[in-house]
């Protein structure tokens, strides 16, 4: 059966609703004709059908006082009016009885169907509808007056508004109703260009036979009394009939509203030219209806909106799909940055064949965006991002500065860490190709610094001059990589390599946070009763007594202690201050120890960690208004830190606080800011430094480019492009600068950079009921990172304020950053499958296409690689750590001998050579761990913001 509009689709207006910019664009899965999942982005609706708001008005009160009352409404899902509670139900999937659909088809087949009706007002529309020969003029007048009667809407506001009102009160409050319609919260959720459809259903005693009418207006007209939201109406459906048992016309009206809310039926009925087309669209809907057995479910149950639905595009006519496919291909060619083909690399990774050609292309590509990189930062969300990332950066600078000071025996310290972070980070944000990247000291680079210092100490070398030559060689090697466009190799960095490296970084964050807390507990030990190591005695001058005599004495209270004769008094009964007041001397290791610091530090540690997690996830909860939830989510880390600081200030315990250097001078006494090229080292060492520099260059390249690949994934919908060559060039220049000043080496920090992007997510404001906010992309700009690093530089002068921040609170934020990044990885979800019995495993797409044993094998290989990386990092063999990172790519290449390309497509990503073995029309497994109810449910119905994580789902 042909659907309406299919036979004339190739006509002049064939592309009226198939606009390539809207079919694909930058909306990702669910865009175009895949349904109304992209309606909330606020873009123009001229190239696709507008969103339809459907309202069901039911005729109630027969035979005493007839009135139209709103009982249901539809956008994407159904909302019923709970009359007893006086409120709208939660959006849910509508369920229909098959007899109601069959009855609706019969009514439409025998009723009035007006397509492209020229009516311009409700009166003209009603006059055409009531022109029924079977009705007498008197009944026509009664029916016309009834249809023109103002319906009673249920508009929820913050105030108390009764559902039922007297006629006199209704007349006096019409102006109030009009005002309420304009203030209706639902109106704020509708995108521009939305239209309305009114369905009127009910029973009339004076009718002898059913009266049905379906009207499609030629031009949308505002039929203001009919709908609660003032919108131009496109469709009008009337279903009236004689009184019957039950509420059959109520269900028939619901069936009509559900039909109009269906994307395929709506598309067809907008193009229908006669009754046959209308009935064909209804029959096509009936062919896809799924029936549930009556004894196996509760008909009153309300099914919540699903997270995933099948692609609506597959439900449209084949001819439309062909045109849509062509439109998608042309849009992909126009914007191949977001939707490039399987064999075509993105523009940033296309070889130019010229020396420094990739760098020149990056500079040209980013130059046109430079003014907007600052103007786009004028948003309150950027203020939250600055606070969050500033505290994370300061904490990172202090932590790695302290670790670097210990590793180099004071050759570098916290001050160098602050200065290097500020200068290198600010310079990178101003000049880099991807300014959202946050430069910082990283665990792998710190390991290399420790090994380099140990080598210098063992062979009596001057460390900083030797380090300078290593930095010069690293900068030279990196510039050579930029000149030869070696960044194109990032195409071989698949999810396997990214997850292995980034899981290691996340584990380093978690390990350092927990390790710092354990060191703090050792510094402030927990006092256990009866332990001699924590005893404290008060010794009076000139009196005898010993500890053993005191320990054998039992005391009931403090007065017994004060009356004892021996010269030693246990300070657990007598405070040191009381001992000194009475002329004694406190003696013992714990006399000046506050016993509550260790436990209180643990409390602050877990409070900040759990609070940050809870506030971050409150956005998806049902608590508080949406604006409050968004503020809590955006400022989650800042609020967690403030809560920890407030709790610490309230109790007033002497917990360790943030230490910020107050003097601007090198940590190592006697050295200036510029490092001498040779010092006490022989001249040939400048050449020998090339060997460790080669290993460090591999580490810098891998660390920088893996982070860049993750940040520039297409799922994040970045509009301004990447800059792989330009970023590596900036890192090379900064490597030379920091080496000359004796500052730490800096490279892209994966976890903090992802946290930076997480704090700059953009989501749609207009969200219809039942729909989650639509992820729109990242707020791309340079100002947040620049301000963060400027504040880091002036933090030396903010010491009076920063000194009140407890270190356990910052350790908790570190733990949160590591856990959040690790837990959101696809790798961790597959690890959970290892520990999950088969019957409890979720129904995910990955397990539908790959055998479970193969999934476990792939996960086990990843775990083995991660464990090997951790062991090498923690042993003296860490000097080969950069080679092991490069070895991840080799391991991934070797997996081609174990797994088929189809399995690797679902488990990982394909390398350039592997893509040639897969058809171009292959399925794209973008949501491997989304629980779908259909084999075709591979596209998200509503593309949500991807969690800013190590590996994007």
Curated annotation (Swiss-Prot):
Q: Where is this region: Disordered?
A: 20-41, 916-938
Question: Which Pfam families does the record associate with it?
Answer: Band_3_cyto, HCO3_cotransp
Asked if the keyword Manganese belongs to this entry, the reply reads no
List residues traversing the bilayer: 385-405, 413-433, 470-490, 501-521, 594-614, 635-655, 682-702, 728-748, 785-805, 807-827, 869-889
Residue ranges annotated as compositionally biased, kind Basic and acidic residues, are: 916-927
Q: Name one GO biological process term.
A: sodium ion transmembrane transport
Catalysis performed (reactions): 2 hydrogencarbonate(out) + chloride(in) + Na(+)(out) = 2 hydrogencarbonate(in) + chloride(out) + Na(+)(in); K(+)(in) + 2 hydrogencarbonate(in) + chloride(out) = K(+)(out) + 2 hydrogencarbonate(out) + chloride(in); Li(+)(in) + 2 hydrogencarbonate(in) + chloride(out) = Li(+)(out) + 2 hydrogencarbonate(out) + chloride(in); Rb(+)(in) + 2 hydrogencarbonate(in) + chloride(out) = Rb(+)(out) + 2 hydrogencarbonate(out) + chloride(in)
**How does the UniProt record describe the way this protein sits in the membrane?**
Multi-pass membrane protein
Q: Which residues are glycosylated?
A: 546, 570, 932, 949
**Keyword set, alphabetical order:** Anion exchange, Antiport, Cell membrane, Glycoprotein, Ion transport, Membrane, Transmembrane, Transmembrane helix, Transport
> What regulates this protein's activity?
4,4'-diisothiocyanatodihydrostilbene-2,2'- disulfonic acid (H2DIDS) potently inhibits chloride/hydrogencarbonate antiporter activity with 50% inhibition at about 5 uM. Completely inhibits chloride/hydrogencarbonate antiporter activity at 200 uM of 4,4'-diisothiocyano-trans-stilbene-2,2'-disulfonic acid (DIDS).
Select a single GO molecular function from the record's annotations and give it: sodium,bicarbonate:chloride antiporter activity
Which compartments does it reside in? Answer: Basolateral cell membrane
| Region feature (Membrane (anion exchange)) | 385-953
Tissue expression pattern:
Expressed in kidney and gastrointestinal tract. In kidney, it is highly expressed in the cortex, expressed at intermediate level in the outer medulla and not expressed in the inner medulla. It is expressed in the cecum, while it is absent in other segments of gastrointestinal tract. Highly expressed in the cortical collecting duct (CCD). Expressed in both alpha-intercalated cells and beta-intercalated cells in the CCD (at protein level).
Cellular component, GO, one term: membrane
Task: Check the record and name the InterPro entries matching this protein.
Answer: Band3_cytoplasmic_dom (IPR013769), HCO3_transpt-like_TM_dom (IPR011531), HCO3_transpt_euk (IPR003020), Na/HCO3_transpt (IPR003024), PTrfase/Anion_transptr (IPR016152)
Q: Does the keyword Glycoprotein apply?
A: yes
The record's comment on protein family reads: Belongs to the anion exchanger (TC 2.A.31) family.
Question: What exactly does this protein do?
Answer: Electroneutral Cl(-)/HCO3(-) antiporter that favors chloride ion entry and efflux of hydrogencarbonate and sodium ion across the basolateral membrane and may participate in salivary secretion. Also mediates Cl(-)/HCO3(-) exchange activity in the presence of K(+) as well as Cs(+), Li(+), and Rb(+). Does not contribute to Cl(-)/HCO3(-) exchanger in the apical membrane of the upper villous epithelium.
State the name under which the record lists this protein.
Answer: Anion exchange protein 4
Native organism is Rattus norvegicus (Rat)
Q: What would be the name of the gene that encodes this protein?
A: Slc4a9
């Amino acid at each position: 059966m042909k659907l309406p509009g299919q036979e004339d689709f190739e006509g002049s207006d064939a592309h009226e609703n198939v606009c390539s910019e809207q079919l694909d664009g930058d909306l990702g899965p669910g865009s175009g004709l895949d349904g109304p999942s992209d309606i909330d982005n606020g873009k123009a609706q001229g190239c696709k059908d507008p969103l339809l708001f459907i309202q069901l008005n039911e005729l109630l009160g027969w035979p005493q006082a007839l009135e139209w009352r709103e009982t249901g409404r539809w956008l994407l899902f159904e909302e019923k009016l709970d009359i007893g509670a006086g409120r709208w139900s939660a959006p849910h999937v509508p369920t229909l009885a098959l007899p109601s659909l069959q009855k609706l088809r019969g009514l439409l087949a025998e009723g009035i169907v007006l397509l492209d009706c020229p009516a311009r007002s409700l009166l003209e529309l009603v006059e055409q509808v009531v022109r029924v020969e079977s009705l007498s003029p008197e009944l026509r007048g009664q029916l016309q007056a009834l249809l023109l009667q103002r319906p009673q809407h249920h508009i929820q506001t913050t105030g108390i508004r009764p559902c039922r009102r007297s006629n006199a009160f209704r007349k006096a409050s019409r102006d109030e109703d009009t005002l309420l319609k304009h203030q209706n919260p639902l109106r704020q959720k509708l995108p521009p260009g939305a239209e309305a459809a009114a369905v009127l259903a009910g029973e009339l005693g004076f009718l002898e036979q059913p009266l049905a009418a379906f009207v499609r207006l030629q031009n949308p007209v505002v039929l203001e009394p009919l709908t609660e939201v003032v919108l131009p109406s496109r469709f009008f459906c009337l279903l009236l009939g004689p009184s019957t048992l039950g509420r059959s016309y109520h269900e028939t009206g619901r069936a009509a509203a559900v039909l109009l809310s269906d994307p395929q039926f709506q598309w067809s009925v907008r193009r229908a030219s006669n009754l046959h087309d209308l009935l064909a669209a209804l029959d096509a809907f009936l062919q896809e209806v799924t029936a549930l057995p009556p004894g196996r479910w509760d008909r009153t149950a309300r099914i919540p909106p699903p997270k995933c639905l099948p692609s609506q595009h597959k439900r449209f006519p084949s001819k439309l799909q062909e045109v849509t496919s062509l439109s998608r291909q042309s849009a992909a060619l126009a914007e191949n940055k977001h939707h490039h083909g399987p064999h075509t690399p993105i523009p940033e990774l296309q070889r130019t064949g010229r020396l420094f050609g990739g760098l020149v292309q990056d500079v040209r590509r980013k130059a046109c965006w430079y003014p907007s990189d600052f103007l786009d930062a004028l948003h309150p969300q950027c203020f939250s991002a600055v606070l969050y990332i500033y505290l994370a950066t300061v904490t990172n600078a202090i932590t790695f500065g302290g670790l670097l000071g210990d590793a180099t025996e004071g050759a570098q310290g916290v001050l160098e860490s602050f200065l290097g972070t500020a200068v290198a980070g600010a310079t990178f944000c101003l000049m880099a190709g991807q300014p959202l990247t946050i430069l910082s000291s990283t665990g792998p680079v710190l390991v290399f610094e420790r090994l380099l210092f140990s080598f210098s100490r063992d062979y009596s070398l001057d460390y900083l001059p030797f380090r300078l030559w290593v930095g010069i060689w690293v900068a030279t090697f990196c510039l050579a990589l930029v000149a030869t466009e070696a960044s194109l190799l990032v195409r071989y960095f698949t999810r396997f390599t990214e997850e292995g490296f980034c899981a290691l970084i996340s584990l380093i964050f978690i390990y350092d946070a927990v390790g710092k807390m354990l060191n703090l507990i050792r510094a402030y030990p927990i006092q256990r009763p009866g332990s001699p190591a924590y005893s404290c005695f008060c010794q009076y001058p000139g009196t005898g007594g010993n500890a053993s005599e005191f320990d054998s004495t039992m005391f009931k209270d403090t007065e017994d202690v004060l009356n004892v004769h021996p010269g030693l008094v246990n300070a657990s009964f007598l405070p040191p201050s009381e001992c000194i007041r009475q002329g004694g001397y406190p003696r013992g290791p714990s006399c000046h120890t506050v016993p509550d610091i260790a436990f209180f530090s643990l409390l602050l540690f877990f409070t900040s960690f759990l609070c940050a997690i809870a506030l971050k996830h409150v956005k998806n909860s049902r608590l508080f208004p949406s604006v409050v939830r968004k503020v809590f989510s955006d400022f989650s880390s800042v609020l967690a830190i403030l809560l920890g600081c407030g709790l610490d200030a309230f109790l007033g315990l002497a917990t360790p606080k943030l230490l910020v250097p107050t003097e601007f001078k090198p940590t190592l006494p006697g050295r200036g800011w510029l490092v001498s090229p040779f010092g006490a080292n022989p001249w040939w060492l400048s050449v020998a430094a090339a060997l460790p520099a080669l290993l460090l260059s591999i580490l810098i390249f891998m660390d920088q480019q893996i982070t860049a690949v993750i940040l520039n994934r297409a799922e994040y919908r970045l509009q301004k492009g990447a800059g792989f060559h330009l970023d590596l060039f900036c890192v090379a220049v900064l490597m030379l600068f920091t080496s000359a000043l004796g500052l730490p080496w800096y490279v892209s920090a994966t976890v903090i950079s992802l946290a930076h992007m997480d704090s700059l997510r953009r989501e749609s404001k207009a969200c219809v009921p039942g729909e989650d906010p639509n992820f729109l992309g990242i707020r791309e700009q340079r100002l947040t990172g620049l301000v963060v690093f400027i504040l880091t530089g002036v933090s030396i002068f903010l010491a009076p304020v920063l000194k009140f921040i407890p270190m356990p609170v910052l350790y908790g934020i570190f733990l949160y950053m590591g856990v959040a990044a690790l837990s959101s990885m696809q790798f961790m979800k597959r690890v959970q499958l290892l520990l999950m019995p088969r019957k409890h495993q979720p129904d995910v797409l990955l397990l539908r296409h790959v055998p479970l044993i193969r999934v476990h094998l792939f996960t086990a290989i990843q775990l083995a690689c991660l464990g090997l990386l951790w062991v090498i990092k923690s042993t003296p063999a860490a000097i080969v750590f950069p080679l092991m990172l490069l070895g991840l790519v080799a391991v991934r290449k070797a997996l081609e001998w174990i797994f088929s390309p189809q399995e690797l497509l679902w488990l990982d990503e394909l390398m350039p050579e592997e893509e040639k073995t897969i058809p171009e029309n292959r399925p794209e497994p973008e949501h491997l761990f989304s629980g779908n109810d259909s084999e075709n449910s591979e596209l998200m119905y509503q593309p949500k913001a991807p969690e800013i994580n190590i590996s994007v789902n």
